[in-house]
Regions:
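Acidic, metal-coordinating helix/loop segments flanking the phosphotransfer/catalytic sites
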Residues: 11, 36-54, 62, 76
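A Lys-centered signature of the CheY-like receiver
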Residues: 108-109
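Short amphipathic alpha-helix used as the core "switch/output" element in two-component signaling
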Residues: 45, 68-80
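Negatively charged, flexible loop motifs adjacent to catalytic sites
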Residues: 89-93
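Non-catalytic signal-transmission and effector/linker regions of two-component phosphorelay proteins
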Residues: 1-11, 76, 113-143
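Conserved phosphotransfer microenvironments
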Residues: 58-72
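Two-component/phosphorelay signaling modules centered on CheY-like receiver
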Residues: 17-35
């Protein structure tokens, strides 16, 4: 399988089993490879050994850590990892903190088309950024 035809890998973190299953099913139907993580601890374990094209993470994980901490950990392991924070809480402090960290927020209940559109946009941006970096590297080599 070439790099262009490989499935995008998405890590989905949510502590509610039904929500995690729903996201997984929707994304797999659209052709994505999904790795579900039911806790911040499991997400960290998975991130220790795998790389992903996108991270979808619930804000409230029912633990000591929030989705912000999971995303920060992931970006420490994989700088530049596109991330979407999902939350049912509407508040300026959440939006401001996310914006400051370069994290997009989707508010629950999530509209499926908005959900899929945000995922496509983040993956497309990541691919464009990678292609641009490769082009710059080749240009510098030929000088």
């Amino acid at each position: 399988m070439t790099a262009r035809t490989r499935k995008h890998r998405i890590l989905v973190v949510d502590d509610e089993p039904s929500v995690l299953t729903t996201y997984r099913m929707i994304l797999e139907q659209k052709g994505y490879e999904v790795v579900p993580a039911p806790s911040a601890q499991e997400a960290r374990r998975v991130l220790e050994g795998d790389s992903f094209d996108l991270l979808l993470c619930d804000l409230s994980l029912g633990e000591k850590e929030s989705g912000f901490e999971v995303i920060e950990f992931a970006r420490g392991r994989q700088p530049g990892l596109p991330s979407l924070l999902l939350t049912g809480y509407v508040g300026k402090n959440i939006s401001d903190r996310a914006q400051g960290l370069g994290i997009s927020v989707l508010f629950k209940p999530v509209d499926i088309q908005e959900f899929l559109g945000a995922i496509r946009a983040h993956l497309s941006f990541r691919e464009q950024k990678a292609a641009s970096s490769q082009w710059i590297a080749r240009s510098e080599e030929s000088e």
